[in-house]
A protein has these predicted regions:
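Kelch-like beta-propeller repeat domains
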Residues: 2-14, 21-369
């Protein structure tokens, strides 16, 4: 068997790409990409186009609730939160605008539980001074059927760019970003000191109370996150500040949290190191789509579409998305992995009049096996 091994150092960042059909495994600080003797069958499917969003908006995030796709947030020029809420009905392939968020934010963590969408933290505009990202600790419950919002007990920690997942009827908010200690201002701005967080906080909807849990070993923001079989998988993300500009640090780490044991372990890294990606789970398989990267020469969003099997700790590279995008709506409904909206390149720069990098495009990976 021909084996290719990529030795990782430091945090184990792997930037080399593997061709389709290879199985990625992690052993003693090395990642091996190799044809398997008895390969686990990767998911099969195709990309299809579906009804576009009512408008092109970046930084919308979504969850599946009662067979529909519920999306919220959005980010406008000048770091202004859009506060949008949309609902997509796959039966009619149609979007509907819903009641806006009571307190518009962007980069809030979202999760679905018991026919509701929960939203935690995020960033709003600072009350004064130049535009920036002001982290908040808001917690909200949204009922799509009633089109109604309910304020919950705020999170103990103010942060944005975190992720959330559900295990055992409780919600876990993980990671995120905020100012460094003694920064003098809670607001973060590009190229100013800021930090990633490893904070983990558990919310119990039955009691409307929070409690702190074991911190994530490698703090990050803008990762993907899914819960499968009682474990939470935090995938990729940004190791430095919240902004992609001026803060390199995309990772392919996969950090798995067991709420029952309140402990963390590291799993096989994702083939593509990226942040601003989105994730969804279908039939026990985690799908990771898109993301962004930036250096002095490239302002890029990814078309990468990869799948992870937590049982075998195996990654596959699947057919790429039709469009590159990051920070988009993503959720599984039926046999489809929906992705919609987002931005098709990575940038926090003023754009010439008439030029936009957000998209209203909506596509889905239709899983056949």
């Amino acid at each position: 068997m021909r084996r290719r091994t990529f030795v990782a150092s430091g945090l184990g960042l792997i930037t080399a790409a593997a061709s389709q059909g290879l199985v990625w495994t992690f052993k003693a600080g090395a990642v091996s990409a190799q044809p398997a003797d008895k390969p686990i069958a990767p998911p099969q499917g195709k990309w299809i186009r579906l009804a576009a969003l009512p408008r092109a908006v970046g930084e919308l995030l979504g969850v599946a609730v009662n067979g529909k796709l519920v999306a919220s947030q959005g980010l406008l020029p000048g770091f202004k939160p859009a506060g949008l809420v949309y609902e997509y009905d796959p039966a009619g392939d149609a979007w509907k605008e819903k009641k806006p968020m009571p307190h518009p934010v962007h980069h809030a963590a979202v999760a679905g539980l018991n026919s509701k969408m929960y939203l935690f933290g995020g960033f709003d505009l600072p009350p004064s001074g130049p535009p920036g990202w002001n982290p908040v600790n808001d917690a909200w419950e949204y009922d799509p059927a009633a089109d109604a919002w309910k304020a919950l007990t705020p999170m103990p920690t103010t942060r944005g760019g975190a992720v959330a997942a559900v295990v055992g009827g409780k919600l876990y908010v993980i990671g995120g970003a905020g100012p460094v200690p003694n920064a003098g201002s809670p607001t973060i701005r590009p190229r100013q000191p800021q930090q990633s967080l490893g904070t983990v906080e558990e919310y119990d909807p039955a009691t409307n109370k929070w409690r702190a849990r074991a911190a994530m070993p490698t703090p990050c923001n803008h990762p993907g996150c899914e819960a499968v079989n009682g474990k939470i998988y935090v995938i990729g993300g940004r190791l430095s500040g919240a902004f992609i500009i001026g803060y390199p640090g995309n990772t392919n780490l996969v950090q798995a949290y067991d709420p029952g044991a309140d402990s963390w372990v590291t799993k096989t890294p994702m083939p593509t190191a990226r942040s601003g990606l989105n994730t969804a789970t279908l039939n026990g398989i985690v799908y990771a789509a898109g993301g962004e990267m930036q250096d002095q020469q490239v302002l890029a969003a990814y078309r990468a579409f990869e799948a992870y099997d937590p049982v075998s700790d195996t990654w596959w590279q699947l057919p790429s998305m039709l469009l590159p995008r990051h920070e988009c709506i993503m959720a599984a409904i039926g046999n489809r992995i929906h992705v919609a909206g987002g931005a098709v390149q990575s940038a926090i720069v003023p754009l010439p009049k008439g030029l936009a990098f957000e998209t209203d495009a909506h596509e889905a990976f239709e899983v056949s096996t």
